[in-house]
């Protein structure tokens, strides 16, 4: 049984960007809020496989301290394997997810959310309009649950929600390569991230080199049902002459495979449970960018609860949540998912997209039917 102290209005499972932002919004709106994570975060944060590039607008929006930024970025270099090259200007930041996520979790705690870490979920079930969540350490109850525990969400697995289609999943491999700051500055540039494309290299996806302070985050991602041998395919990227030169004399400190959704989960809401961020597949299908959409979806879940309670329309909660998502950004992500198949159909289409991407945002390319 959950003690009185363990009864909440809203329980958020997963303290990534989506979960922490939802917990912050929940606490700020006066809800008794519990944020749970299976990992230990309070000391140094926890490692997440992620390139870690975010837009400067997001840095400013959340007042992210500049001393926590691993590298400020001013441009994006797009390499096609046949030698063609494209450049895109735009200010951004490369961050370590351990540091970034901890900052957001700390913000949620400061706003009044209760945080429980190192508590993996063991079970979840509903009884009399209340969800009972059991972790490795305790049992908690709440009316609403925010599933923010990633693409392989245990919350939604226990609730028997349908999983993603294989064509909506990207398998990524990330290697953290330790090197010197001076070599990164000299070879990759002081303020540049590098992306690599080519249907022969990666049928539906891309690879990347994201410089941090003294580390290059090297990554590769391909649609999972097209992957035959991930190590061989990753090594094909690693053997490109530019990549070999960038990583010479570097030392691997982390190797991590990871899944990224690039299409929506078949449902995003059911019976007072919300899927946010990667758990719902709320990710840019072309770039794989997920951090801002996770944060916005977490906040919109809370706003939807507040609106429906105020108007006494809790029966419309799922409709309101998806309508809010559509208005903010989901309509564009859905259009991008359709466009993605055409972009990666052949190298001609891919290059046309890369050329347009130099000048336009990917959302403009898709919504204006430029491709």
Predicted segments, located by residue:
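N-terminal FAD cofactor-binding segment of flavoenzymes
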Residues: 40-76
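C-terminal helical "tail/cap" subdomain of flavin- and related membrane-associated enzymes
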Residues: 306-371
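Conserved Rossmann-like nucleotide-cofactor binding loop
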Residues: 18, 41, 152
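Beta1/beta-strand and adjacent pyrophosphate-binding region of the FAD-binding site
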Residues: 2-18
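Predominantly flavin-linked oxidoreductase catalytic cores and closely associated redox partners
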Residues: 109-245, 281
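FAD/FMN-dependent oxidoreductases across multiple families
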Residues: 94, 121-123, 224-304
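Glycine-rich FAD pyrophosphate-binding loop
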Residues: 11, 15, 27-48
């Amino acid at each position: 049984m959950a003690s009185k102290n363990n009864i909440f209005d809203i329980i958020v499972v997963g303290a990534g960007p989506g979960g922490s932002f939802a917990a912050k919004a929940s606490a700020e709106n006066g809800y008794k809020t519990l944020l749970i994570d299976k990992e230990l975060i309070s000391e140094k944060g926890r490692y997440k496989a992620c390139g870690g590039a975010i837009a400067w607008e997001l840095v400013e929006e959340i007042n992210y301290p500049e001393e926590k930024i691993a590298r400020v970025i001013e441009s994006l270099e797009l390499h096609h394997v046949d030698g063609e090259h494209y450049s895109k200007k735009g200010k951004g930041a490369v961050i370590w997810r351990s540091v970034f996520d901890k900052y957001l979790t700390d913000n949620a705690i400061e706003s009044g959310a209760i945080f429980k870490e190192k508590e993996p979920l063991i079970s979840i079930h509903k009884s009399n309009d209340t969800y009972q969540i059991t972790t490795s350490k305790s049992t908690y109850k709440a009316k609403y649950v925010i599933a923010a525990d990633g693409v392989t969400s245990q919350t939604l697995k226990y609730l028997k929600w349908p999983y993603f289609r294989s064509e909506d999943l990207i398998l990524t491999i990330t290697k953290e390569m330790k090197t010197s700051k001076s070599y990164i500055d000299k070879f990759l540039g002081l303020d540049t991230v590098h992306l690599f494309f080519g249907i022969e290299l990666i049928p539906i996806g891309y690879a990347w080199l994201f410089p941090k302070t003294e580390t290059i985050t090297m990554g590769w991602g391909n649609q999972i049902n097209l992957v035959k041998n991930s190590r061989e395919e990753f090594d094909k990227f690693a053997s490109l002459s530019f990549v070999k030169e960038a990583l010479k004399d570097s030392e691997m400190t982390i190797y991590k495979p990871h899944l990224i959704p690039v299409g929506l989960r078949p449902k995003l809401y059911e019976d007072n449970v919300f899927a946010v961020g990667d758990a719902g597949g709320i990710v840019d299908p072309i770039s794989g960018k997920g951090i801002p959409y996770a944060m916005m979806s977490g906040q919109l879940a809370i706003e939807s609860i507040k609106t429906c309670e105020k108007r006494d329309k809790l029966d419309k909660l799922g409709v309101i949540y998806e309508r809010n998502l559509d208005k903010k950004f989901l309509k564009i992500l859905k259009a991008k998912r359709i466009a993605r198949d055409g972009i990666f159909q052949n190298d001609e289409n891919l290059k046309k997209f890369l050329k347009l991407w130099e000048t336009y945002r990917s959302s403009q390319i898709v919504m204006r039917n430029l491709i």
